[in-house]
Regions:
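Helix-loop-helix hairpin linking two adjacent transmembrane segments in secondary transporters
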Residues: 3-5, 181-232
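Symmetry-related core transmembrane helices of the 12-TM Major Facilitator Superfamily/SLC fold
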Residues: 8-14, 207-225, 463-480
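Extracytoplasmic gate region of multi-pass secondary transporters
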Residues: 59-67, 296-353, 412, 416, ...
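Cytoplasmic membrane-interface "Motif A"-like loop-to-helix N-cap segments
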Residues: 105-116, 361-375
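C-terminal ends and interior cores of transmembrane alpha-helices
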Residues: 117-136, 376-390
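Hydrophobic core of transmembrane alpha-helices in multi-pass small-molecule transporters
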Residues: 122, 136-156, 394-410
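Cytoplasmic helix-loop-helix junction between adjacent transmembrane helices
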Residues: 146-185
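C-terminal transmembrane helical hairpin of 12-TM major facilitator-type secondary transporters
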Residues: 366-418
Length: 514
C-alpha cells in the first residue's frame, strides 16, 4: 500500500476510536445518558466534525500548493502567496466577534449552514477562476477576495460548533469530548497538506478548491437533515432524559483541576463567596470590560504569548512545504507529502493529550510550566528541521514534523485553556474573542511579511523568526502567570453575568471556544 493509503487508514483508526469512546465507553456519558441518547448525539456532532475537517481543507489548500513548481506555473511570487494567506487570516480576525454574535442570534444550526454553504460557494468559484484561465491581474484580485471571504464565513462554523455541542454535553463531559472532537478537526490538516500534492499532480491546482467545496455543499445537506440545536429539538427524548445531573463546574475548577484536599477547597470556596457578598459589586459595561482587559497584565502577557505562538505555528505550517521543496535535491512526491501531512496530523492528536496529561499528572495541574517547556522544545525542533531537512530521509523528516506538531499544537491547545483560569472572572468572558482576533492577526502578519522575506533573503530569517517566536511565547506565558499571582482580588462582574464562559475556538469546545 502507498504511504497515503496507510496514513489515511491510521487517521481513520484514530477517528473511529474517538467515535466509539464517545458513544460507548465514556464514563460520564454512560452515567448521564441512555445509549439511545449517546448515539443520537453522535449523529449530531459527527457531521459537524466532518464539515470542520473540510473547513481546514478549504483553509490550508493554499498552503498545500505554496511550492515553487505551482507558484511558477501560476505566475505567483512568494510575496503574493503570503498576501493571499494574510487576507484570509485578517478577514477571520476582524469578523470573529461579529460572526459569533450573529450566530448567537440566528442559532447554531443556521450558523453552520451559512459557514458550509458560504465556504462551498467561495471554493467552487475559486476552482472556476483557475479552470477558466482568467487574465493575470483579475485572477490575482479575485483569488485574494474569494479566499478572504472563504475564511471569513468559516467563522460562523466555529461559533456554531461551540454553541450546539455545549447544548448536548454536560460540563463534566466536555473535557474529554474536546479531545475527541479535536481529532476530527486535526484530520483536516491531512486532507489539505497530505493529499494536496496528489490532487494537484493528478487533477490540477483548481481541484484543491473544487473538492472541499463539493464536500462542504454535501455536508450542508446532511447537517440540514440531521443536526439539531439541542436535544429538545429532536422530539425523541422526554424531559427526564434531557436532564443533565452533573452540577455546573466553575471554569477555574474545570481548567485548573482539583488536586487539593476537599475540605480545604470548601473552606476556600466559602471564604471567596463571603468576600463576594461583602464586597461591592460593580457591573461593567462592554466598554468598561475592554478597559479592564487592557489594564490586566496577566491578560496582556497571555495575549502576547498567543501572538508569538500563532506566528510560529502558522508561519511554519504555511511555508514548510515550500521550504522543503527549495532545499532538497528532488521535489517532494505525493507519497512524501502524505507522510509529512500525516505526521503533522497525528502529532496534533498526541500533542493536545500529552501536554494536558503532563500538566495534570506531572505538574499537578500547573498549566504554565508545560507551556514554557514545550515552547523551548518547539524552538529546538524548528531549528533542527531547518538544519537537517536538506539531507535527511523522508521518514526522518516525518518524525521531526511529528515532534514539532506535538509541541506546537499541544502548546496551542493548553494555552487556550489557561487564560480563563488565571484571569479574574469579571473579565474572563471577553478575553477569548480578543485572543482569537490577535492570533489570526499574527497569522496574517506572518504571511504578509514571510513571503517578502523569503523572496529577498531566503529561509534563514524565516527559521530564525519561528525559533524566536517560540521562545517568546513561553516567556510571556510565564510573565502572565507571574502577574496573575501578584494581582489583587476583583469584585466587579459583567452585566449581565453569562451562564458559562465560552471560548470561541474549535480547539476548546469545553469552554465553550477556536
Amino acid at each position: 500500500m502507498s504511504a497515503q493509503v496507510v496514513t489515511s487508514l491510521l487517521i481513520l483508526a484514530f477517528v473511529a476510536c474517538g467515535v466509539l469512546y464517545d458513544a460507548l465507553l465514556s464514563p460520564q456519558g454512560r452515567l448521564l445518558h441512555s445509549q439511545a441518547f449517546r448515539w443520537r448525539r453522535l449523529q449530531n456532532w459527527f457531521p459537524m466534525g466532518v464539515a470542520y475537517a473540510a473547513f481546514y481543507m478549504a483553509r490550508y489548500n493554499v498552503a498545500a500548493g505554496n511550492v515553487s513548481a505551482v507558484r511558477e506555473k501560476l505566475g505567483f511570487t512568494s510575496a503574493y502567496m503570503g498576501w493571499v494567506l494574510s487576507a484570509g487570516s485578517w478577514a477571520y480576525a476582524i469578523s470573529g466577534p461579529f460572526t459569533g454574535q450573529i450566530t448567537d442570534r440566528i442559532g447554531g444550526k443556521r450558523g453552520m449552514l451559512i459557514a458550509c454553504l458560504g465556504a462551498a460557494v467561495c471554493n467552487l468559484l475559486l476552482g472556476v477562476l483557475f479552470l477558466c484561465n482568467t487574465p493575470g491581474v483579475i485572477q490575482q484580485i479575485f483569488f485574494i477576495v474569494l479566499y478572504a471571504a472563504n475564511v471569513l464565513v468559516q467563522g460562523f462554523g466555529t461559533s456554531a460548533v461551540v454553541k450546539i455541542n455545549a447544548a448536548w454535553y454536560a460540563p463534566s463531559e466536555r473535557g474529554l469530548f474536546a479531545g475527541v472532537f479535536n481529532i476530527m478537526l486535526t484530520s483536516g490538516y491531512f486532507l489539505a497538506l497530505g493529499t494536496g500534492s496528489s490532487i494537484i499532480g493528478s487533477l490540477g491546482w483548481p481541484y484543491v478548491f473544487v473538492i472541499p467545496g463539493a464536500v462542504l455543499f454535501e455536508m450542508a445537506l446532511v447537517i440540514s437533515r440531521y443536526v439539531k440545536n439541542s436535544p429538545s429539538d429532536t422530539h425523541n427524548f422526554t424531559n427526564k432524559q434531557l436532564v443533565l445531573i452533573s452540577p455546573p463546574q466553575q471554569p477555574a475548577d474545570a481548567l485548573k483541576g482539583s488536586s487539593k484536599d476537599g475540605s480545604k477547597d470548601k473552606a476556600s470556596s466559602s471564604a471567596d463567596n463571603q468576600t463576594e457578598d461583602e464586597g461591592e459589586k460593580i457591573r461593567l459595561t462592554p466598554k468598561q470590560q475592554m478597559k479592564e482587559l487592557m489594564r490586566n497584565y496577566t491578560f496582556l502577557g497571555y495575549l502576547v504569548a498567543v501572538f508569538f505562538l500563532c506566528w510560529a505555528r502558522d508561519g511554519f505550517l504555511n511555508w514548510f512545504l515550500s521550504f522543503f521543496d527549495a532545499v532538497r535535491e528532488s521535489p517532494l512526491t505525493a507519497s512524501d507529502t502524505a507522510i509529512i501531512g500525516g505526521a503533522w496530523t497525528v502529532g496534533g492528536f498526541v500533542g493536545g493529550i500529552l501536554c494536558g496529561w503532563l500538566s495534570d499528572v506531572i505538574f499537578h495541574s500547573d498549566r504554565v510550566m508545560p507551556i514554557f517547556i514545550f515552547s523551548l522544545l518547539q524552538a529546538f525542533m524548528l531549528g533542527l528541521i531547518y538544519f537537517v531537512s536538506a539531507t535527511c530521509s523522508v521518514a526522518m523528516l516525518g518524525g521531526l514534523i511529528f515532534l514539532s506538531s506535538v509541541f506546537l499544537l499541544g502548546n496551542y491547545t493548553l494555552l487556550s485553556y489557561t487564560v480563563p483560569s488565571d484571569l479574574p472572572r469579571d473579565i474572563a468572558a471577553g478575553a477569548s474573542g480578543i485572543m482569537t482576533a490577535v492570533g489570526y492577526f499574527s497569522t496574517g502578519l506572518s504571511g504578509a511579511i514571510m513571503g517578502g522575506i523569503i523572496d529577498g533573503a531566503g529561509y534563514s530569517v524565516w527559521a530564525l523568526s519561528l525559533m524566536a517566536a517560540s521562545v517568546l511565547a513561553g516567556v510571556f506565558t510565564k510573565l502572565g502567570s507571574y502577574f496573575s499571582a501578584k494581582r489583587p482580588k476583583h469584585h466587579a462582574v459583567i452585566a449581565p453575568v453569562p451562564p458559562k464562559i465560552e471560548e470561541r475556538t474549535p480547539l476548546a469546545p469545553d469552554s465553550s471556544d477556536n
